[in-house]
């Protein structure tokens, strides 16, 4: 687990929680929740890779882990599109920087999860 990614998650979550986007704050809360969920999933998948013996227990414990992996990639794609949309509509520079960093982090995490999943397959 890359410490820079962990601190990036924490930084972006903190920044997003401070943002005030008026009527769309519910949507922002949804994005924050998705980010937190994605972080937990990424961390657990990374830990499973580090303990390669966990592959069998992961498969036994959850026979649908590949399906869940596909769902996570769908969530990442949704988050990427949502963050891109927010980036296009915001004029606040603080929000623009936050969303640009969030987009970069999502792309990095997507790549990490792909790498982890290939190691587990």
UniProtKB/Swiss-Prot annotation:
GO cellular component: host cell nucleus; virion component
The keyword Metal-binding is assigned to this record: no
Annotated localization: Virion; Host nucleus
Gene Ontology biological-process entries: exit of virus from host cell nucleus through nuclear pore
One Pfam family it belongs to: Flu_NS2
Chief place of localization: virion
Top-level taxon of the source organism: Viruses
Record's function text: Mediates the nuclear export of encapsidated genomic RNAs (ribonucleoproteins, RNPs). Acts as an adapter between viral RNPs complexes and the nuclear export machinery of the cell. Possesses no intrinsic RNA-binding activity, but includes a C-terminal M1-binding domain. This domain is believed to allow recognition of RNPs bound to the protein M1.
Misc. remarks from the entry: Average number present in a viral particle is estimated to be 130-200 molecules.
Subunit composition and interactions: Interacts with protein M1. May interact with host nucleoporin RAB/HRB and exportin XPO1/CRM1.
Similarity field: Belongs to the influenza viruses NEP family.
Protein name as annotated: Nuclear export protein
The species this protein was found in: Influenza A virus (strain A/Wilson-Smith/1933 H1N1) (Influenza A virus (strain A/WS/1933 H1N1))
């Amino acid at each position: 687990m890359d410490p820079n990614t962990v601190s990036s998650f924490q930084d972006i979550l903190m920044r997003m929680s401070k943002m005030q986007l008026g009527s769309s704050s519910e949507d922002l809360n949804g994005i924050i929740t998705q980010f937190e969920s994605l972080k937990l999933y990424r961390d657990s998948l990374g830990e499973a890779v580090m303990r390669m013996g966990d592959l069998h227990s992961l498969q036994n414990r959850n026979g649908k882990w590949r399906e869940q992996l596909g769902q996570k990639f769908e969530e990442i794609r949704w988050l990427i599109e949502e963050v891109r949309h927010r980036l296009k509509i915001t004029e606040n520079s603080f929000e623009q920087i936050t969303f640009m960093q969030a987009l970069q982090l999502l792309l990095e995490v997507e790549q990490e999860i792909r790498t982890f999943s290939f190691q587990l397959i």
